[in-house]
């Protein structure tokens, strides 16, 4: 590894120590459906976001709720204390497209229609309100 590349890798590694996040990969729902849920909680306080997700009727909400609980646990693990009410916020959440499984459905006159079964990756960052303002 080159010297400059090594230095930038070390900087990135140090920056990750102050970030608290959780990732969910290869979720078998379309990214479009997952983004609807992600947009609901972006920027919210974590306890309020958990309440919103708990009472949401969307299937993706249960997965994002579990991911949010994991991110909170990661924050508590790194800081060696419990998170207090109003302290943590969802600073960033984004949904990226994952692998697409392609299937064929029989169609009239000997043709086949392609069905795309999409998946996605969700990344969720939590932090304090001051961290949220610094990152923007």
UniProtKB/Swiss-Prot annotation:
Gene3D superfamilies hit by this protein: Ribosomal protein L22/L17
Name of the protein in its database record: Large ribosomal subunit protein uL22
Similarity comment: family membership: Belongs to the universal ribosomal protein uL22 family.
Keyword rRNA-binding: yes
Organism field: Bacteroides fragilis (strain ATCC 25285 / DSM 2151 / CCUG 4856 / JCM 11019 / LMG 10263 / NCTC 9343 / Onslow / VPI 2553 / EN-2)
One cellular component term from this protein's GO annotations in UniProt: cytosolic large ribosomal subunit
GO function terms (MF aspect): rRNA binding; structural constituent of ribosome
Example of a GO biological process term: translation
Protein's gene: rplV
């Amino acid at each position: 590894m080159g010297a400059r590349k090594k230095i930038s890798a070390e900087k990135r590694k140090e920056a990750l120590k102050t970030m608290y996040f959780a990732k969910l990969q290869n979720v078998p729902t379309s990214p479009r459906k997952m983004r609807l849920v992600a947009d609901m909680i972006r920027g919210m306080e974590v306890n309020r976001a958990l309440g919103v997700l708990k009472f949401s009727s969307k299937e993706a909400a249960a997965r994002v709720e579990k991911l949010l609980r994991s991110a909170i646990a990661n924050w508590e693990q790194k800081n060696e204390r419990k998170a207090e009410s109003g302290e943590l916020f969802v600073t960033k959440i984004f949904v990226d497209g994952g692998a697409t499984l392609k299937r064929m459905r029989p169609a009239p006159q000997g043709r086949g229609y392609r069905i795309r079964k999409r998946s996605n990756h969700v990344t969720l960052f939590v932090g304090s309100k001051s961290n949220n303002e610094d990152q923007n």
